[in-house]
Amino acid sequence: MRSIQLIFLLVFSISVFGSQAIGHAPIGVMADHMHKKGESMISLRASYMKMKGNSLDGNSISDGEILVIDNPHSNSPAKLSVVPIEMSMKMLMLGGMYAPTDDITLMFMTMFMDKSMNLNTFHAMMRNNIGSFNSSSSDLSDLSFSALVNINEQDKSRWHAEIGLKFSVGDKNEKGKVLTPMNTNMEMLLPYGMQLGDDSIALVVGFTNLYTLSDAHTFGNQIRFFRNISSEEWHYGDKTYFDSWYQYSVSRNFSISSRLRLNHQQDISGFD
């Protein structure tokens, strides 16, 4: 399934509490700001992603090319015969922050995920399309706990670091009804991409820089690394995110921002 590697967003931010809207990065950026001693915050974020097409080694690949690839896990059928069409993901994230001191902010995040995938099935021998089916999974996906630590703060620039752990708590053995290449319906283990977790623990390390251009203009950069330090038979690959954003303050409670994201994820490690 082809994923989006470069994302550009135009975001409108509204603050309904005491802080200024420009003081918070675009909604897709996590761990972007710190709080003063005794301050706390609760957040609820919703996002949606849809993907179409397939890729191999970073290049687009057609259904016909997939159907001549050897089945790596079985000789029946000998070739891959079930091909994804499109996939959607809905994510709901509940988070909280609390600052015990001016230089340390504690943060937690939990995510609920809903996945849906449409697939085509091709006959094991004749290789003709015999139909399509849908598989889905939804539940709590992961929990994370982090500490944000102030590194350097000046009049117009601030640096802080993030160190934390992310726990995958979603089911890694989700099953669903599958239309098989023999034109039968069977209850089977869903593919890796449809699983809600991998029973892994990941170390989270990040660095964020915020620069104030003027009272109405700010600029920010952030890099975050997710490295697996404990896993079972298989786990999703390590991830790296880089975000760069610009914000313009329309008023105290309203700002406009644009964000550029680059992301990289390594291949799945191991197999089930």
What is each residue range found by the language model?
Residues S55, S62-S76, S231-D272:
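Outer membrane beta-barrel transmembrane domains
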Residues A31-H33, L44-A46, L94-Y98, F108, ...:
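Residues on the lipid-exposed face of transmembrane beta-strands in outer-membrane beta-barrel proteins
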Residues F17-D70, N150, K156-R158, V169-N173:
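Outer-membrane beta-barrel biogenesis signature
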Residues M111-N228:
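Outer-membrane pore/translocation modules
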Residues S40, D103-F108, D155-W159, A216-F219, ...:
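Repeated loop/turn-to-beta-strand initiation elements of outer-membrane beta-barrel proteins
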Residues I27-A31, K50-L56, P100-D102, S116-T121, S146-Q154, G170-K175, S230-W234, ...:
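Outer-membrane beta-barrel proteins
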